[in-house]
Amino acid sequence: MHAQVQTQEHSASGSLRFNGIGKTFPGVKALDGISFVAHPGQVHALMGENGAGKSTLLKILGGAYIPSSGELQIGEQTMAFKSTADSIGSGVAVIHQELHLVPEMTVAENLFLGHLPASFGLINRGALRQQALACLKGLADEIDPQTKVGRLSLGQRQLVEIAKALSRGAHVIAFDEPTSSLSAREIDRLMAIIGRLRDEGKVVLYVSHRMEEVFRICDAVTVFKDGRYVRTFDDMSQLTHDQLVTCMVGRDIQDIYDYRGRPRGAVALRVDGLLGPGLREPISFDAHKGEILGLFGLVGAGRTELFRLLSGLERNTAGRLELRGHELKLRSPRDAIAAGILLCPEDRKKEGIIPLASVAENINISARGAHSGLGCLLRGIWEKGNAEKQIKALKVKTPHAGQQIKFLSGGNQQKAILGRWLSMPMKVLLLDEPTRGIDIGAKAEIYQIIHNLAADGISVIVVSSDLMEVMGISDRILVLCEGALRGEVSRDQANESNLLQLALPRHRADGVAN
């Protein structure tokens, strides 16, 4: 996949080795004899389902945890990190999802926190600025060192974190889900920087659930399962998406999508000549009872905009909707919910969950109005029972229903949002990127829930930018491009080529065809 920029000297003296690493917590063996090697001049992915042990291993590498067994080597030297300071001092940097920067301090102050240049007991602001500019050069030239970190975008903060690591002489750099909240442009920039780190001979570890990123930037991948080492693939050019998924979950890729053919029912939702914000041409289609209808398109195709119209978040300027044979006018999301059209939004952290509320509160919040007449006592009993019912039915992994939802994994947060809608009368479910940022095991569970809903007669419409996903779970696929419906493809006829031909703007599609 990528040329390895490494020498024999690098390979002998700078490799990162995990030798039989184990970590036990009371009653839990988080890691069990992990052994593998990551080389300089490589981007080495760590993959596995949630709970596989990836984050625990990074915490050991970063000095936050002390291993219960085994040893860590960098080059020929055995490391015994007892703190994060030990790890940093040995040239290791771990870039976590939650960045360790102080928002109220400037970029320059964050870069040199703990060793600020000083003269006569006072911070030398001139020297600090010059040193900060040197750190940011070629990495984030547009960032003013005097800007407070809290005013930067998430992508810019990440660049500051990387600059900070490099300023401390890091030669082993680990990224933990670095793109989970970045825009497409920020992801491209990060990929270029990681490629540069590889070319400079750094050891780069990369933890991600996103297959496309792993195949795009990584030279090798090691798979974990249930805290154990499974396998290392050293040649990405010989590895397929399906092989990697099967290795991670122990099942064939088609078993993960769990497709079940079913007879198509009557029309549940009829969309006739719909126009509104973000749509360039009138859109018409039918969605049937018991059907999973896929919506595919590239960024800017109008998929999310269509969902906003169908869920009452935006008002249509033309066209009409029918729900099970009756005309439907949507003036607000409340109208859609009352009619039984429910939306799981794309950005679950901003639009789906209430982070500081409990799992139970997140599940019950939309159904409270329907049970307001019960009185406090009876409503409390119903809410407790409903939350426990949904947690059990959807296999939401949480210590208890009162746990704040922000502490759950992305997959379990998504299942809790689905539990919210399962608590209410539903006719049509709109799922916008339902498995984005979720590990492959949780994806399989989400797919199972989707199929169960369709089997119960619900019309499920799924927006996904993942071609494999939309082909794997859908009965039919509608393709949008630049705010217009370009075509419909049956499950039997769908393949990557014909879906992309429809999804690409005409001039780009012609170029692909030629």
From Swiss-Prot:
GO terms for cellular component: plasma membrane. Keywords: ATP-binding, Cell inner membrane, Cell membrane, Membrane, Nucleotide-binding, Repeat, Sugar transport, Translocase, Transport. Its EC number is 7.5.2.12. It is an enzyme of class 7 (translocase). ATP binds at G48, E49, N50, G51, A52, G53, K54, S55. It catalyses: L-arabinose(out) + ATP + H2O = L-arabinose(in) + ADP + phosphate + H(+). InterPro entries: AAA+_ATPase, ABC_carbohydrate_import_ATPase, ABC_transporter-like_ATP-bd, ABC_transporter-like_CS, P-loop_NTPase. Residues 16-251, 251-507 form the ABC transporter domain. Pfam families: ABC_tran. Its main location: membrane. CDD domains: ABC_Carb_Monos_I, ABC_Carb_Monos_II. One of its GO terms (molecular function) is ATP hydrolysis activity. It is a peripheral membrane protein. It is found in: Cell inner membrane. Belongs to the ABC transporter superfamily. Arabinose importer (TC 3.A.1.2.2) family. Part of the ABC transporter complex AraFGH involved in arabinose import. Responsible for energy coupling to the transport system. The complex is composed of two ATP-binding proteins (AraG), two transmembrane proteins (AraH) and a solute-binding protein (AraF). This is Arabinose import ATP-binding protein AraG.
